[in-house]
């Protein structure tokens, strides 16, 4: 959890926002996945948001569903994902690592065991996409027992009670949802979200990172202008992977270009 606090402190001192890329672990293969993640970090990623491939991803659009299918085709399992995570942490000791998950994968070997594994490999936060806040108590408790930040989604229509609860129980960062629906670069994020960011700040919530539909530098600037501490981009990155599976060198060149441009937009 401290890695997020350190990151936001350093960025505030530099007057920068955070740019956080999302990819599926093991896409298109475990070895290439590590290459991709090294490339994202070298290009300027401030933190990582990583998915463990799941067979029935309700919140994901087709781009991220296809990434899971590619990982499955390469034989990726949750156990292999944890091996990849351990390797990332060993190479990159300071970058915050977040997981974006589905509850079935957390339940699989028991909630406590899951968070224990996260702590062992150096994961900082876990967001469970299909667990609403009202049902999150057992996950929150296990997360905090193991020093993992529980991340909550703040939807665009959140009422005051929910904002207070998220502020009170969330750690690390707050996932500010641009809009309802599924992920996808085609579905542009809807702003402004200033009122939500203001309320979250008033209630001392963890810094807000805006996600869903963030695919170009102008949207990163808009997120920061609305008061968010940064932006998360997934589908746009996974699309670059999808289009270049057969040309890994070109893939890494394009990923570097994309992340460099998105990170540049966080500098005021």
Curated annotation (Swiss-Prot):
Active site (catalytic residues): 49 (proton acceptor), 60 (proton acceptor)
E.C. code: 4.2.1.20
Keywords of this entry: Amino-acid biosynthesis, Aromatic amino acid biosynthesis, Lyase, Tryptophan biosynthesis
Annotated Gene3D superfamilies: Aldolase class I
Pathways involved: Amino-acid biosynthesis; L-tryptophan biosynthesis; L-tryptophan from chorismate: step 5/5
Pfam families tied to this protein: Trp_syntA
Keyword Cell membrane: no
Taxonomy, superkingdom: Bacteria
Family annotation (InterPro entries): Aldolase_TIM (IPR013785), RibuloseP-bd_barrel (IPR011060), Trp_synthase_alpha_AS (IPR018204), Trp_synthase_suA (IPR002028)
GO molecular function terms listed in the Swiss-Prot or TrEMBL record: tryptophan synthase activity
GO CC term, one of those recorded: cytosol
Reaction(s) catalysed (UniProt annotation): (1S,2R)-1-C-(indol-3-yl)glycerol 3-phosphate + L-serine = D-glyceraldehyde 3-phosphate + L-tryptophan + H2O
EC top class, as a word: lyase
Assembly description: Tetramer of two alpha and two beta chains.
HAMAP family from the UniProt entry: Trp_synth_alpha (MF_00131)
PANTHER family assigned to the protein according to its UniProt record, in alphabetical order: TRYPTOPHAN SYNTHASE ALPHA CHAIN, CHLOROPLASTIC, TRYPTOPHAN SYNTHASE, ALPHA CHAIN
NCBIfam families: trpA
Similarity comment: Belongs to the TrpA family.
General function of this protein: The alpha subunit is responsible for the aldol cleavage of indoleglycerol phosphate to indole and glyceraldehyde 3-phosphate.
Stated name of the protein: Tryptophan synthase alpha chain
Gene symbol of the encoding locus: trpA
């Amino acid at each position: 959890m401290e890695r997020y606090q350190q990151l936001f402190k350093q960025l505030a001192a530099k007057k920068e926002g955070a740019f956080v890329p999302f990819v599926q672990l093991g896409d298109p293969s475990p070895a290439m996945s590590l290459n991709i993640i090294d490339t994202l970090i070298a290009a300027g990623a401030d933190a990582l948001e990583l998915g463990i491939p799941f067979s029935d991803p309700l919140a994901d659009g087709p781009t991220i569903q296809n990434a899971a299918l590619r990982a499955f085709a390469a034989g990726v399992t949750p156990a292999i994902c944890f091996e990849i995570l351990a390797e990332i942490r060993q190479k990159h000791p300071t970058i915050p690592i977040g997981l974006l998950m589905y509850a079935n994968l957390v339940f699989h070997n028991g909630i406590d065991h899951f968070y224990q594994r996260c702590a062992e490999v150096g994961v900082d936060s876990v967001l469970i996409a299909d667990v609403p806040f009202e049902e999150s108590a057992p996950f929150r408790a296990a997360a905090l027992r193991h020093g993992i930040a529980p991340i909550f989604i703040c939807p665009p229509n959140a009422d005051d009670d929910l904002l207070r609860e998220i502020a009170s129980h969330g750690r690390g960062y707050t996932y500010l949802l641009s809009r309802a629906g599924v992920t996808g670069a085609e579905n542009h994020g809807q702003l402004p979200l200033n009122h939500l960011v203001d309320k979250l700040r008033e209630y001392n919530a963890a810094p807000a990172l805006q996600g869903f539909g963030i695919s170009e530098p102008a949207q990163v600037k808009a997120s920061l202008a609305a008061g968010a501490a940064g932006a998360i981009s997934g589908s746009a990155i996974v699309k670059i992977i999808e289009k270049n599976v057969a040309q890994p060198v070109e893939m890494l060149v394009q990923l570097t270009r994309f992340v460099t441009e998105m990170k540049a937009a966080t500098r005021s």
